[in-house]
């Protein structure tokens, strides 16, 4: 689960991490009061969306002005004007896609007198099952670009969970950022606090970009991005309360209500499969035959008729879907249950696109019989290769 920048900074503040002072606003009329509380003389007006590249992004609406999603204001009047322009407008960044995201909240933050910018992040290293630090002197820009163009400027290391964070980890970060004396001590203290926060809140990723050194000699997190482990949210009701569903895909939210593993993709063939591995293979073979999947959807091993019906409705709700491939290998999941769910869903929502069904495994003959006698226009398939070829041909011929 992702949260907004201002929420991430509030979480870090709980652990004593130095972050800038600011106030979130939801209406343009709140901008003046927020700016006055901060005092000035410089303010930063930041769009709050779940996507990076806000500063270099552009708004779709001409009324929002030519500047990006992060703007420097040198007067309260400018803060008010930016708030009016940005709230409700659609911001397009390198991470939002062409559709962009509507800005429904802003973060008004005090300006900082910046001397240097750094990059610092913590993430779960799946290869070592440890928390990894990634550090660079090249802050304020895409770490992917740094890795591609100047990989020697990136330092990374993992923390042994048996020992936890130790002093030498902080000193490693300080050395990587060329910090000495008092600034090195600040870095060491910050590293310990960030690690503690990461573990305590079950984070997946914590990115500070940029981490800045002010001209007063203080380290400060100028931006913060946090992603939490969804499987651990039951332990953190305070974090659950920070969820902003307007930033999430409506179909993915609906799928989560039925414990369906669903991810929206940008293709045109909807997929319903049981098992993550089989789902990946199904998407691969669709790609092999020249088309792209519209989603990843794993209904799991013990899906009910109602769950299958819900899954089918979610797929058909996507206007980009031009065909549907259902690929089920029945083990715990029975093929007749899938068939009943598909028939019920089609009769309820209708079917305007080609549908190919491949069933194999437990109760397969009963499942095929249900579909055959349903009166629906369904193309049966004998195996995965046959199913992929049939759905691709049907969509191209439609």
Curated annotation (Swiss-Prot):
The keyword Cell inner membrane does not apply. GO terms for cellular component: cytosol; succinate-CoA ligase complex. Binds 1 Mg(2+) ion per subunit. Its EC number is 6.2.1.5. ATP binds at residues 46, 53-55, 109, 112, 117. Transmembrane segments: none annotated. Its cofactor is Mg(2+). One of its GO terms (molecular function) is ATP binding. Residues 9-254 form the ATP-grasp domain. It catalyses: succinate + ATP + CoA = succinyl-CoA + ADP + phosphate; GTP + succinate + CoA = succinyl-CoA + GDP + phosphate. Pfam families: ATP-grasp_2, Ligase_CoA. Substrate binds at residues 274, 331-333. Mg(2+) binds at residues 209, 223. Keywords: ATP-binding, Ligase, Magnesium, Metal-binding, Nucleotide-binding, Tricarboxylic acid cycle. HAMAP family: Succ_CoA_beta. Heterotetramer of two alpha and two beta subunits. Succinyl-CoA synthetase functions in the citric acid cycle (TCA), coupling the hydrolysis of succinyl-CoA to the synthesis of either ATP or GTP and thus represents the only step of substrate-level phosphorylation in the TCA. The beta subunit provides nucleotide specificity of the enzyme and binds the substrate succinate, while the binding sites for coenzyme A and phosphate are found in the alpha subunit. This is Succinate--CoA ligase [ADP-forming] subunit beta. The lineage of its organism: Bacteria, Pseudomonadati, Pseudomonadota, Alphaproteobacteria, Hyphomicrobiales.
């Amino acid at each position: 689960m992702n949260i907004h920048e201002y929420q991430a900074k509030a979480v870090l503040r709980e652990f004593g991490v130095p972050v800038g002072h600011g106030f979130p606003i939801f209406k343009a009329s709140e901008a003046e009061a927020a700016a006055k509380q901060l005092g000035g003389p410089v303010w930063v007006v930041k769009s709050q969306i779940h996507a990076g590249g806000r500063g270099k992004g552009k708004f779709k609406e001409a009324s929002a002005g030519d500047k990006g999603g992060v703007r420097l204001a040198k007067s309260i009047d400018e803060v008010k004007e930016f708030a009016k322009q940005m709230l409700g407008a659609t911001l397009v960044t390198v991470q939002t896609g062409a559709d962009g995201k509507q800005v429904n909240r802003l973060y008004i933050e005090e300006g900082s007198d910046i001397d240097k910018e750094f990059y610092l992040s913590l993430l779960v290293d799946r290869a070592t099952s440890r928390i990894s630090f990634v550090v660079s002197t090249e802050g304020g820009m895409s770490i992917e670009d740094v890795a591609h163009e100047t990989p020697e400027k990136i330092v990374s290391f993992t923390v042994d969970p048996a020992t936890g964070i130790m002093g030498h980890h902080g000193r490693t970060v300080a050395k990587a950022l060329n910090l000495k004396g008092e600034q090195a001590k600040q870095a060491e203290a910050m590293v310990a606090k960030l690690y503690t926060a990461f573990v305590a809140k079950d984070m997946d990723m914590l990115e500070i970009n940029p981490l800045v050194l002010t001209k007063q000699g203080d380290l400060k997190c100028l931006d913060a991005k946090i992603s939490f482990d969804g499987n651990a949210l039951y332990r953190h009701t305070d974090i659950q309360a920070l969820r902003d569903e307007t930033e999430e895909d409506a179909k993915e939210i609906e799928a989560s209500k039925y414990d369906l593993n669903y991810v929206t993709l940008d293709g045109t063939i909807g997929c319903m499969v049981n098992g993550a591995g089989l789902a990946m293979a199904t998407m691969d073979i669709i790609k092999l035959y020249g088309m792209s999947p519209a989603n990843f959807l794993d209904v799991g091993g013990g899906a009910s008729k109602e769950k299958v019906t819900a899954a089918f409705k979610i797929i058909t709700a996507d206007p980009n879907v031009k065909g549907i491939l259902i690929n089920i290998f029945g083990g715990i999941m029975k093929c007749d249950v899938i068939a009943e769910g598909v028939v019920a869903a089609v009769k309820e929502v209708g079917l305007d696109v080609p549908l190919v069904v491949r069933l194999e495994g437990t109760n397969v003959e009963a499942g095929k019989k249900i579909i055959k006698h349903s009166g629906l226009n369904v193309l049966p398939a004998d195996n995965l290769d046959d199913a992929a070829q049939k759905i691709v041909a049907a969509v191209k011929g439609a």
